[in-house]
Amino acid sequence: MQSSNNFYIVGSGIQRGSTYLGDGDPLSPDWASVPNAYRLDPKELTDLPKIPAQPIGYDDAKIILDSMGGNEVPSEWKGNINTTYNLGGSMKNGYKIKLSTHNYFGNKKSSNVIGYIKGAVEPDRYVILSNHRDAWGYGSVDPSSGTAQLMEVARTFGEMLKKDWRPRRTIVLASWAAEEYGLEGMFLLDLLTYL
C-alpha cells in the first residue's frame, strides 16, 4: 500500500462514480426529463454498460492483476500499478473470482430547487449560479462546500433585495439533484431555447 502522504488516494480507497457514459436521464436522452415526458422503454437502451461493475481500491486491483494469466497487454494499455498487465482469460494458480452485484434498474424521483431574481433591464437573459447537492458519500467536499457557497450567495442577494437592489439580468439560483447519476438533475435540455 502506498503512503497517504502523496497526491493519490490510499490503496484501500475506492473511487465511486457512474458507469453510464452519457449525460442526463438515459430514458429521455435528447429531451428534458420532466413529469409526463415521453420516456424510452428500458429494453430499448443501447448505451448502458452491459457488464457488471464493482469499484475497488488499487491494492485489491493489484492482487487480481498479479493473478491474471494470458498474454501481456500492449504497452499503451498498461497502468501505474507495479505488476505485469495480462489480457486474462484464465487465472494463475487456478484462482477464480466471484462477483456479486446488487444493482437494480428503477426510476426514482429527484427534485431541483430553483429560485429566480427577475432582472430589471434584461429579464430574458440569465446568470445561472448553481451546484449539485447529491453525493456518492457524505459529501463534505463535493458537493457540500459548493452548496454552502450557493446558500451564502442566496442569503447575500436576499439582503440586497431588502435594500431595493435589482440585478440587470435575471439571476437563477439552482440546487441540482441526481448530478452524480449522469447529470440527470440538470434542467438544461428544458431551457435550451432560452440559453
Regions found by a protein language model. Name each.
Residues 1-19, 120, 188-195:
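Mature extracellular/periplasmic domains of secretome proteins
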Residues 1, 129-131, 147:
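Extended active-site and interfacial segments that coordinate phosphate-rich ligands
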Residues 135-195:
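Acidic/histidine-rich catalytic neighborhood of metal-dependent amide-processing enzymes
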Residues 8-10, 14, 19-21, 136, ...:
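Generic detector of intrinsically disordered, low-complexity, polar/charged segments
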Residues 20-141, 155, 159, 163:
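Soluble metallo-hydrolase cores and metallopeptidase-like ectodomains found primarily
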